[in-house]
């Protein structure tokens, strides 16, 4: 019996030694590391009403930013457990400009040996991944040793790198409730030298991500009756490069409501459908043009809609004198089998700066991982620049059939229209 215990103890010791993470030093030196939550920023919450540039309310973000120019001989290793969420990605940004230059989304992250990627195949239990961030100019021989499919590269000329994690709709492991960290610990960050020996992790320096905001400006077209939707260009505001956005903007009035109807993209119901889905997720998000923060949103599974059917979205000021009647009308329409979603915008709500969020709103229709080959995909449209010194978005339209969503996508493209209270209630 004693011999059996000794054998089992030795076997367990071997297994533990073999399962030490690949990012550890192979010459026996151990470098103390803080816990992952100490390595990453505090949670940047999409629904925290703090972040600018119209974030999605259903997404949490974390950043780790470091000086790439001062650590050009270091490889970063991110090792963690796949989170329990609808969508997960790692993006790399030039923190001096906000431009995205690399990244990897959940379904393309290889699972560690013995694990399964839960964004590819339905699975249970804990599943792990490893991602390496290598400096520009890293020899291919080093990349080959790491496994090229696990490597993301720092672009030439980028001096300061912001690594951002995104979790959409994170839950506990059993999916029963919302969870800030999607039921897992954040990935641990370690560092290797070019000989793949463990070395010190670069200092986490202050990032510009938390400070980002889109430009605040006025537009004459905000007063127009129609609010067209445009495809957003890839911007300098730390965008998710795996996401496409339609945007529109208008001034809400007390004597009318803003409405738009279209057929939303169908979404997959299980991981096995993710790869061939026309989009992973969609949401409608409403933000204030006065501070570029998001305040209201609804995502696919919470919206009133059905695949292949038109859904209607109505935005009404809280101070609209006919609000009660408008609410009753929407309830009646839904009772009659329509798919109508009502947003009540409180223009007098104070933001964190103590200012009212106002009556001018930006409306975003967001698609994650849109399939450009799908004939109704918003990603097929031609992007339209935001307001600049040459004019407003509507002034940048040179090809309406490719730039205006309702023309480019037909029933799958929204067009906002201000409808008088009386006409809406007829």
Please state what every model-predicted region is:
Residues 30-426:
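A compositional/structural signature for long, glycine/proline-rich flexible linkers
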Residues 18-22:
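C-terminal motif of bacterial Sec signal peptides marking the signal peptidase cleavage site
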Residues 1-11:
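Bacterial N-terminal signal peptides that target proteins for export
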Residues 24-27:
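Bacterial signal peptide processing site
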